[in-house]
From Swiss-Prot:
GO cellular component: cytoplasm
Keywords for the protein's UniProt record, in alphabetical order: Cytoplasm, Hydrolase
Known partners and oligomeric status: Heterotrimer of UreA (gamma), UreB (beta) and UreC (alpha) subunits. Three heterotrimers associate to form the active enzyme.
Protein name in UniProt: Urease subunit gamma
GO molecular-function terms, A-Z: nickel cation binding; urease activity
Pfam family, one: Urease_gamma
PANTHER family on file: UREASE (PTHR33569:SF1)
Entries under CDD domains matching the protein: Urease_gamma
E.C. number(s) listed in UniProt: 3.5.1.5
Gene expressing this chain: ureA
GO BP annotations, alphabetical order: urea catabolic process
Recorded family membership: Belongs to the urease gamma subunit family.
């Protein structure tokens, strides 16, 4: 199977997000890479589902709360930018303060 670098990145993000979901389900607090992967994957999947950039900017702030992450992680992520593929092309989605 031949994958482009972008496809490899998407697969890596999805894998990290899946691991984060499992750890969260077990009651573990997520670390920085897990939190970023989970929020990023939610945005990418939302774009694939046809949601708008504005909807995803809001949804990105609801994926995780401070209770879901280790101490200090929320402060380490002032914003997340995701280049997501929408039905009408690729767009940049920026989520400010994704963990509140």
């Amino acid at each position: 199977m031949e994958l482009t670098p972008r496809e490899k990145d998407k697969l890596l993000i999805f894998t990290a997000a899946l691991l984060a979901e499992r750890r969260r389900a077990r009651g573990l607090k997520l670390n920085y890479p897990e939190a970023v992967a989970l929020i990023t994957a939610a945005i990418m999947e939302g774009a694939r589902d046809g949601r708008t950039v504005a909807e995803l900017m809001h949804e990105g702030t609801t994926v995780l709360s401070r209770d879901d992450v280790m101490d200090g992680v929320a402060e380490m992520i002032p914003e997340i930018q995701v280049e997501a593929t929408f039905p009408d092309g690729t767009k940049l989605v920026t989520v400010h303060h994704p963990i509140v």
